[in-house]
Regions:
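C-terminal regulatory/interaction regions
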Residues: 339-340, 347-375
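Active-site-proximal loop/helix segments of hydrolase catalytic cores
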Residues: 252-255, 260-309, 316-317
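Active-site neighborhood of phospho(di)ester-bond hydrolases with catalytic His/Asp-centered motifs
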Residues: 120-123, 143-151, 174-177, 285-289, ...
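Metallo-beta-lactamase
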Residues: 181-273, 335, 364-375
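Primary recognition of N-terminal secretory signal peptides and signal-anchoring hydrophobic helices
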Residues: 1-82
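Conserved beta-strand hairpin/beta-sheet module of binuclear metal-dependent hydrolase folds
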Residues: 87-136, 268, 272-287
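Active-site metal-binding motif and surrounding structural segment of the metallo-beta-lactamase
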Residues: 128-180, 302-311, 334
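Pre-active-site segment of Zn-dependent metallo-hydrolases
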Residues: 101-102, 116-145, 256-259, 294, ...
Length: 375
C-alpha cells in the first residue's frame, strides 16, 4: 500500500512538471535545471521560445513536495517519501568505554543495516569485528556490500578476515577508483615525534597501507566495483560519494606520504569515499578518516544532494587541527543545523572536548558498540 501511494504521488508530481507551462509563475530567459529527488529531470517540455517556465510552487507543496530555487536551478523533493528504518552499529573503534565486553582497537568499522541493503563500512585493524558483531546480534554473512573508505591499515586490516573467515553469502567490495594505485602509503616523522599506534616517533618512513592487494582479492574471487564518479547508489537509501576536491581550509597532512617508484609524494587521498544513508530525518553521512577534510566532505555531499544533513558519524581527522580550525568546524556544523555528530577514531581529545563543550546536545562519542537507530 505504501509503495502504491508513493508511486501515485510521484506520478502526480511528474504530471505537474510536464504541464508546468500552463502555470508560468516564474520565467527565465536562460534555461534552468530541474531536479526531482536529487535527480535531473527533463525540461524540454518547459521551453517556450527559449524561455523556461516553472509551475506554482504552492500546488507542488500541497502534494507534500518541497521546492527550492537556488543558483538558477529548481530542486523538487517529495517530502512525504517514507524511508525504511536504519540501524548503524560501530563494530570497532579506539575505545570500548561503554561496552567493555567488546574488543576495541585503533581503527574503525561500522555496519549499516537497512531493509534492502546491509553494508560493512571499513573493517578495522586486527580482524576482531566478527566476534564483536556476534555479541551485537549482527550476522556478517548477510553483508551485501563491503566499503573501504581509504587504503590505510586501520580501516582495511580486517579485509582478510572477512574474505577468508566470514565469507558473506553474496557481496561486492566497493573502493575508490584509485584505491589500488594508492596502496603504498607511508607516514613520515622527522624524529622526536609523539608515539602513535604505528610508530614510536623515530625519524623516517613507516608503512601504513593495506596487507592485501588486488591480486589477493582476485585470487579469492571477490567482486570489486569502483566509485569512479561523484555518486554511486548501493540501494534506494544508501549511496557512496567520491571525487572530493581539496578544500581551502582543511589542508592535507604533509606527514602522509605516497610512495611512487623510489620517491615519496604528498598523499592526496584521491581514493577516499564516504557513505550516506537517506532517512526520514535527513541524510546520515558516514566517514572513515576524512583525510580530505570533514567539512569538505559534508559540504560537498550537501551541494550534490540538496538534502538536509541529519547526522555525521565517524572519523574527522581533527586530531591534527588547531583551535581555529576546530572552531571553524563547529561553526559550520551549527550553520548546517546538523542534529547528531558522532565523533570517532581520529578526531582527537582536544577536538572532542571542544566540540562537546560548545554543542553538548548534538555531540556524542561514537565508540565500539554504539548503535544508532532511525525509524
Amino acid at each position: 500500500m505504501k509503495a502504491k501511494k508513493k508511486t501515485i504521488c510521484l506520478m502526480l508530481v511528474t504530471a505537474l512538471i510536464v504541464t508546468m507551462c500552463a502555470l508560468p509563475v516564474l520565467a527565465s530567459g536562460t534555461p534552468i535545471n530541474v531536479y526531482v529527488n536529487g535527480q535531473p529531470a527533463p525540461t524540454t517540455n518547459l521551453l517556450i521560445n527559449d524561455v523556461t517556465y516553472m509551475p506554482a510552487r504552492y500546488l507542488l507543496e500541497l502534494l507534500g513536495v518541497q521546492v527550492e530555487y537556488k543558483d538558477g536551478s529548481v530542486y523538487i523533493n517529495q517530502a512525504n517519501q517514507v524511508k525504511g528504518p536504519v540501524k548503524i552499529s560501530t563494530l570497532t573503534e579506539n575505545s570500548n568505554e561503554n561496552h567493555p565486553d567488546l574488543i576495541n582497537e585503533f581503527g574503525l568499522s561500522m555496519f549499516i543495516d537497512t531493509l534492502d541493503c546491509n553494508v560493512l563500512f571499513d573493517t578495522g585493524k586486527l580482524g576482531n569485528i566478527p566476534e564483536n558483531a556476534k555479541k551485537l546480534g549482527i550476522d556478517l554473512k548477510k553483508t551485501d556490500c563491503v566499503v573501504l573508505s581509504h587504503a590505510h591499515y586501520d580501516h582495511c586490516g580486517g579485509v582478510k578476515t572477512v574474505v577468508e573467515n566470514v565469507k558473506p553469502d553474496d557481496y561486492t567490495l566497493y573502493v575508490g577508483k584509485s584505491f589500488f594505485d594508492n596502496l603504498q602509503k607511508y607516514h613520515y616523522s622527522p624524529g622526536g615525534g609523539p608515539k602513535l599506534d604505528f610508530t614510536d616517533g623515530h625519524k623516517g618512513y613507516t608503512y601504513i597501507g593495506t596487507n592485501f592487494d588486488k591480486a589477493y582479492l582476485d585470487e579469492h574471487k571477490v567482486k570489486i566495483k569502483y566509485v569512479d564518479c561523484d555518486e554511486v547508489k548501493l540501494s534506494k537509501q544508501i549511496s557512496l560519494f567520491g571525487n572530493f576536491k581539496p578544500g581551502a581550509v582543511e589542508k592535507m597532512n604533509p606527514a602522509m606520504q605516497l610512495k611512487v617508484g623510489d620517491k615519496y609524494i604528498q598523499d592526496e587521498f584521491t581514493e577516499e569515499i564516504a557513505l550516506t544513508v537517506d532517512t526520514n530525518k535527513g541524510l546520515i553521512i558516514v566517514t572513515g578518516c576524512s583525510h580530505t577534510g570533514i567539512l569538505n566532505i559534508v559540504e560537498t555531499i550537501k551541494e550534490r544532494t540538496h538534502k538536509p544533513i541529519y547526522a555525521v558519524l565517524g572519523g574527522t581527522h581533527l586530531i591534527e587541527a588547531d583551535a581555529a580550525r576546530i572552531q571553524h568546524t563547529i561553526d559550520a556544523f551549527n550553520e548546517m543545523d546538523i542534529e547528531k555528530i558522532g565523533l570517532s577514531h581520529c578526531t582527537g581529545t582536544l577536538a572532542i572536548d571542544t566540540i562537546a563543550t560548545q554543542i553538548p546536545d548534538k555531540v556524542f562519542y561514537n565508540s565500539t558498540g554504539t548503535v544508532i537507530k532511525v525509524k
